[in-house]
A protein has these predicted regions:
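Short, basic/glycine-rich phosphate-binding loops at helix/coil junctions
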Residues: 33-35, 55-56, 60-70, 122-125
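A short secondary-structure junction motif
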Residues: 41-49, 114
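Substrate-recognition element of Asp-dependent hydrolases with the DxDx(T/V) motif
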Residues: 66-113
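Asp-based, Mg2+/Mn2+-dependent phosphohydrolase catalytic module
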Residues: 2-6, 105-106, 110-189
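Hydrophobic alpha-helical core bundles mediating ligand binding, dimerization, or RNAP-core interactions
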Residues: 21, 35, 52-57, 73, ...
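Active-site neighborhood of HAD-like aspartate-dependent phosphohydrolases
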Residues: 1-40, 44, 58-63, 167-168
């Protein structure tokens, strides 16, 4: 059985941070002090969802409730990439085991399960919030290999993460607009 390490944001679904910033009245070019730290701390599991919401309440300086912050944060996740969906279906038809390999947080893990039509077919995952580090950290790649072994293919949209995979000897491919179609064509050949 072949193994795919699959990033989520920018590969399985579109990310729309601009909608989050708009909902919180934040300027993405001039984020308030503490925003990036709170984001990273949440992404690596240093703080939980409640603390993240409280931190954002203080950072935003507005009277947003935890529920409003949650709703705004969920706007980060947009729509499923149907080209990726078709690629995954073809891989499953050929017996591939697919594992999510993503920098993400509990709220987004919960949300992507509602957005991705195939999410229940991918119960296995390595998430940054569980590992305590983000890609391209060695800790993420090591955690994946210790649990699942070295993947036959790794797809990610971020070049720095692809470079991290290559450093670990992975067959890493940067995901672009045409990657899913190219891989589908190769599978049919």
């Amino acid at each position: 059985m072949k193994l795919l390490a699959l990033d989520i944001g920018g590969v399985c679904l579109r990310l729309t941070p601009e909608r989050v910033f708009q909902s919180m009245n934040l300027d993405p070019d001039n984020l308030p002090d503490g925003y990036e730290k709170a984001y990273l701390d949440y992404s690596i599991g240093k703080i939980g969802s409640w603390q993240f919401a409280k931190d954002l309440q203080a950072i935003v300086g507005q009277s947003m409730t935890v529920a409003q912050i949650h709703d705004a944060w969920m706007k980060f996740l947009d729509t499923e990439d149907l080209k990726t969906t078709r690629l995954l279906e073809a891989l499953w038809d050929r017996g591939w085991h697919i594992v999510f390999f993503s920098d993400t947080q509990p709220w987004h893990i919960e949300g992507l399960r509602d957005i991705l039509s195939y999410s229940k077919r991918i119960p296995d995952a390595i998430y940054s919030c569980d590992v305590g580090a983000e890609k391209p950290s060695d800790a993420m790649f090591t955690a994946f290999e210790e649990r699942y072994g070295r993947p036959d293919l790794y797809l990610d949209d971020r070049l720095c993460n692809i470079e991290g995979g290559l450093r670990h000897g992975w067959n890493a491919v940067q995901f672009t607009e045409t990657t899913a179609e190219q891989l589908l064509a190769e599978l049919k050949a």
